């Protein structure tokens, strides 16, 4: 076999764009100073072998079993995945350091309903450290095999020997292929290692979960092609000093990307939170100025969240604007609506907006709730008692209709709320709701109902 030739190539660390020379600005993603030099080996002859080919088949000839999904034993994870794990799927689990990625994957090994063996490969921890975590989480299954290895070729030999049904790799940034001369974690290694894992998943029907690091900006570390190659991208998020964790699907070929799973970090590991609304509102004081409850939709699940606003006179020439959990640009737009349409001199005030519990909400249905919290804080007047607020606000101050109103109100009724201020366009003649509903057409009407006691 002819020996491969080495050549120097420059890769963009953000998107994986390849160039023969160094470039200041990447033509692929537009980022500056992201190119690094790597040595790659160009294979010749039949060295670059492809995956085994298959014969073309018609749709009628392809066998498909809808109940083929594997129950992970973790209800919140099943929800995010779309009903369970699909055999042969390659999944990427990313999140900040210390957020609980390794804890979640280790708990999965003890709860999953699977007869096949499970191979847990770690390139970051020793066998003793992994056993300590397993004992702390109460995991003692005989199906679980632990391997500490960074060489993907060695890992392949153990897969051929053990023949597992599930492979967990922690993490993709620490493994390497020996035929690639660049260091582990480089663009070339990440791309080639992911390609190898994809070959195993599709060729062997092996479910693969890969743990990935994130950058300081919160994006998945490595080239963008990494996210394109996998079937599912899961993101585990939460505040470092907050014990709640949110699992989201940023990409899912086998289900929705709008669902979330809620967990609580405890000494014994991650505990599922089946009723997030109760958790997020558990410490909410009654009749508090600047606080409002909004029923949000996370996929098909209604979740009640508390919005808190603090409006104070600014001692500086340039007022401060800070948001946590809500979209900054949308909040700025709503402030402009208040200034223009309601004649409120809010522009010279410091504005602080927070979604309690570390949840990130980006749907327009919280617009009216944001406005209500801001005006309540500015005028030092509490919101209407036992009320929830929802509605999208337009640039002219009108309150627009929203989706899934009945689901949101049913959740509000479960949590003891008795009144809902909603868009008038959502109300139909003769329609019944579980709680009292007040329809409003614009921001002025909504504020009179919420702050005037009407």
Listing of model-derived features with the role each one plays in the protein:
Residues 147:
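Conserved SAM-binding strand-loop segment of SAM-dependent methyltransferases
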Residues 118-122:
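Conserved RecA-like ASCE P-loop NTPase motor core of nucleic-acid helicases/translocases
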């Amino acid at each position: 076999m002819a020996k491969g030739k080495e050549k120097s190539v420059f890769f963009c660390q953000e998107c994986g764009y390849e160039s023969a020379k160094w470039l200041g600005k990447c033509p692929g993603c537009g980022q500056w100073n992201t190119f690094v030099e790597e040595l790659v080996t160009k294979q010749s002859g039949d060295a670059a072998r492809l995956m085994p080919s298959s014969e073309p088949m018609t749709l009628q000839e392809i066998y498909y079993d809808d109940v083929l999904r594997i129950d992970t034993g973790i209800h919140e994870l099943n929800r995010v995945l779309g009903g369970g794990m699909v055999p042969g799927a390659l999944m990427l689990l990313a999140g900040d350091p210390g957020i609980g990625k390794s804890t979640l994957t280790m708990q999965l090994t003890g709860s999953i309903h699977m007869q096949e063996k499970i191979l847990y490969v770690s390139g970051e921890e020793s066998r003793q450290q992994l056993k300590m975590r397993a004992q702390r989480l109460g995991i003692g299954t005989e199906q679980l095999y632990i391997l500490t290895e960074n060489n993907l070729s060695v890992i392949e030999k153990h897969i051929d020997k053990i023949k597992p049904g599930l492979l967990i790799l922690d993490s993709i940034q620490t493994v390497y292929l020996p035929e690639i001369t660049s260091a582990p974690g480089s663009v070339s290694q990440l791309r080639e290692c992911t390609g190898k894992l994809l070959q195993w998943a599709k060729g062997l029907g092996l479910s693969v979960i890969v743990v990935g690091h994130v950058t300081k900006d919160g994006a998945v570390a490595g080239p963008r092609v990494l996210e394109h190659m996998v079937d599912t991208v899961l993101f585990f998020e939460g505040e470092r000093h907050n014990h709640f964790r949110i699992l989201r699907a940023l990409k899912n070929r086998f289900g929705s990307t709008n669902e979330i799973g809620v967990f609580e970090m405890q000494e014994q590991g991650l505990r599922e939170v089946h009723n997030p609304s109760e958790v997020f509102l558990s410490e909410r004081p009654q009749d508090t100025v600047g606080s409002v409850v909004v029923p949000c939709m996370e996929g098909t699940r209604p979740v009640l969240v508390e919005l808190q606003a603090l409006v104070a006179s600014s001692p500086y020439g340039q007022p401060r604007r800070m948001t946590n959990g809500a979209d900054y640009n949308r909040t700025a737009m709503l402030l402009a609506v208040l200034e223009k349409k309601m004649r409120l001199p809010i522009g010279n005030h410091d504005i602080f907006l927070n979604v309690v519990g570390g949840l990130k909400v980006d749907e327009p249905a919280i617009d009216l709730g944001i406005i209500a919290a801001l005006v309540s804080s500015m005028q030092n007047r509490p919101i209407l008692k036992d009320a929830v607020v929802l509605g999208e606000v337009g640039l002219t101050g009108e309150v627009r209709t929203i989706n899934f109103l009945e689901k949101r109100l049913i959740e509000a009724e479960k949590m003891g709320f008795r009144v809902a201020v909603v868009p008038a366009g959502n109300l139909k003649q003769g329609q019944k709701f579980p709680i009292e509903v007040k329809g409003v057409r614009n921001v002025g009407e909504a504020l009179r109902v919420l702050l005037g006691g009407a």
